[in-house]
């Protein structure tokens, strides 16, 4: 800690930290700026016990319940990112932009993602403007336009905040924004739990919550260790190592899966159809029968773990790079055999990591169903995993940045 404090005084790291903190504070302030024309007291009382709104508030830090200008949060941008990243694996032009055109191609993909996020934010904002109609003082076309513009603009600001944090700050912007929104709800949760300690069952609830929190943290740290694969150079005969992580995607599969589960909730609030509402209730983490939700959530985490691993590591590219460096894996022929070996190894690691991640995400809900102890009301395992994962990723990025700065100073 002393070395971190000493190094943080160096030029660069302080600016990044201050920028990150400043943008996170601004993102929180926006949730308290209400959209005009809505009876916010009546609206809050009406939806305060709505489990779907409670789920949506995870991503907006309470902004959805108060209909602040940042009510949509980072969800439109995450949804757009999911669509574009899926498209890069199936649309040749996008795949070419990502792999062959370098930084210019990635910037074009980022621009496409922004436009898609803008469109999705406008659609969601329009839907919310119709949803709050019973609580609006003077609902007309002018109000619909004003609210759509306000929520869309707020979502675009959040998107810009996230990009600035990623590029010029510390950590992953979208992850940190979700992180700070979850943290914002902790004081209220702690107060509720403190006031509730009056019986053995309630004390047991806190013990289980603390135990699962520690359990989540330990498992999540363990599954992020590196898997070492030995390589040998042909001429110099030096031994080096190719690191493969058990969980390539980190916390992103959890965030992506949660973002997908938010979509039916949005539709359920806008489309007042009995079938849609029933489907939304079944896919809600607060539903009475969580079996369908748990199966769907488990499957989404598995899918996005494999999907994210395929984006981060391409076995064919790694094989070609090893061949160019005149290196090989002992006992494996260069070329296609190396590619197949890497793909097989990556699939096994991803499968184990995805199972760990999905299991830790759903086991608290299973325990809650069995014991009938509502341990995770307000702070589910998903939130715990996101908190732990983002904290680990951010601290690791700070350490990497400090090491690179020290190396640059030595070279100078």
From Swiss-Prot:
Highest taxon listed in the record's lineage: Eukaryota
The reply to whether Zinc figures as a keyword in the UniProt entry is: no
For the keyword Transport, the answer is yes
Q: Which residues cross the membrane?
A: 17-37, 58-78, 117-137, 143-163, 170-190, 251-271, 293-313, 350-370, 372-392
Membrane topology recorded in Swiss-Prot or TrEMBL: Multi-pass membrane protein
Might you name a Gene Ontology BP term for this protein?
protein transport
Q: What Gene3D superfamilies is this protein classified in? A: SecY subunit domain
One Pfam annotation reads SecY
Keyword vocabulary terms for this entry: Chloroplast, Membrane, Plastid, Protein transport, Thylakoid, Translocation, Transmembrane, Transmembrane helix, Transport
Q: PANTHER family under this entry?
A: SECY/SEC61-ALPHA FAMILY MEMBER
What is this protein's record name?
A: Protein translocase subunit SecY
Q: Which gene encodes it?
A: secY
